[in-house]
């Protein structure tokens, strides 16, 4: 159980739901046991989440007090425990830390020589906060409506639980937007953009050009857009063959990255300044 990603349990629950819909009634006897105990899967997933939180809280807080770098603390602790299976656990741990346990974001420290924020870009963080506020206002109204219309009262409470769980990720994304920067660390660009997008460590040597761009960038293959509720204003062109990680895809080819920053001109100048000595040496 310690090495079983939480998403595996969610996939199992979804598989049971799919099976209950497509298996013919005549051949459905083996499914009766699963259908009668369908709540077991989300219960197991909730238990795994609680175990992850309780296991990490004390250890990570101690590491953060020592270094101030919560990303490094979470990554080192989870990699030591789960090895190659650490990625989904790291995503969940960040959600709980930024969504629930973060108290003083200004005290956080991040790897890098120069840091660039993106929370003020076109009211990025403010728009996220407004959306969360609207969902909180809607929660009691939705509960009342479901309580009156649902066949059983527990369904309204179950919907509340799912909505609160979704709000956890939205709050975590908002707080990560406020405090997690895009950074330059030596000859590496560290792309941290909220917590719902996978972090990237890109060698500056792999960046062919860095320039201003407009906000009208369409979704297409090989293009990564990091915008949230802001506007795109920086374009990075990468060397051919560059592959980056994603939340759901381990590696995918990416030739261009568009992102929105509070200080695009300062970022472009800093990247070019760091690239210049290396290109002169070549």
Where are the regions that the model predicts?
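N-terminal membrane-targeting/pre-transmembrane regions
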Residues: 56-151
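Juxtamembrane/interfacial segments around transmembrane helices
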Residues: 59-68, 91-103, 178-190, 208-218, ...
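Non-transmembrane, membrane-adjacent beta-strand/coil modules in membrane-associated proteins
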Residues: 193-260
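Conserved beta-hairpin
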Residues: 165-210
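Structured, soluble regulatory/oligomerization domains located on the cytosolic or IMS-facing side
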Residues: 235, 249-282
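Alpha-helical transmembrane spans
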Residues: 1-62, 123-179
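Membrane-interface module
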Residues: 5-14, 31, 61-64, 83, ...
